[in-house]
Amino acid sequence: MDLGKRMRMKRVVDRSGVSIICALDHGMTAPRFLEPLADIRTRTAEAVAGGANVIMMSKGMIRTAEPAFGPDTSLALLLSASANPGRDRPEVVQVAQLEEASRLGADAVVLFTALSGDTEAGMVRTLAAVGEACERLGMPFIAEAEFPTTYATVEELEQQYGFEYLRRNVRLCAELGADIVKTNWPGDPESFGKLVEAANGIPVVLAGGSRLEDKELLWRMQVAVEAGAIGCSVGRNIFMHASPEAITRALSRVIRERWSSDKAHEALVEELGS
């Protein structure tokens, strides 16, 4: 890892060895517009106030959201968008380049990786090209090794694609140059541990996925960290929450401060009720 990548990784993964990513990129991937994202600057400010050290978003939205970034907040620029996102297997299209990420001050780039059908070969080529460019230009690469669509429940996705889909995707991303792998909750702690093992030492963060009860979200994060994850990448469960700042703070307490999920949930309930 060269000097530029090491310097950027120190910001993406903080001094405590943790990465708490708030994903505000759903305007590029969702099958419909999600109303809370209409005010991207406020959502950014809330996540930063709650303890997120990385904000994931598009090249268009950073121009609006930048004033809400703190001095230690990293930008992770999403390089891809989803074509036909309402389908079971949307097509991933690269819509930004590493040169743009560097010009915008990003500390990392992100690529959604969907292995499905006729588009899989092109996806693998794109993944490899981004991995090579990131190594050459010193840019950390966050690869999203996820189910082809994340707008369904874990149970539905597991039934449709299976655990081995996720494990193969995680390993492929690690093989082709990812510096951090983001992946879905596979349904149980033991299976998540196997995903961490498949990454073979490449840091793993757990995706938040579809909307969950707060207690379930915090529990998943606790067991993910216990299984070896270095953090989370959460979107809808933050920006669609009644208090994005409070739920981000609860996530930070579980991941960064190693509170139990029960203790963090109790504090969250108290904060929301005050």
Would you name each region that the model predicts?
Residues G187-D188, S210-D214, I238-M240:
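Short Gly/Pro-enriched loop/turn and capping motifs at secondary-structure junctions
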Residues V225-G228, F239-S274:
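C-terminal helical cap(s) of enzyme catalytic domains, especially alpha/beta-barrels
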Residues S19-N84, R89-V204, K215-I230, R253, ...:
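Alpha/beta enzyme core
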Residues M1-H26:
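N-terminal basic, low-complexity leaders that serve as flexible interaction/assembly modules and, when applicable
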Residues V12-R15, P31, A65, H241-A242:
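Surface-exposed loop/turn and secondary-structure junction residues enriched for glycine/proline
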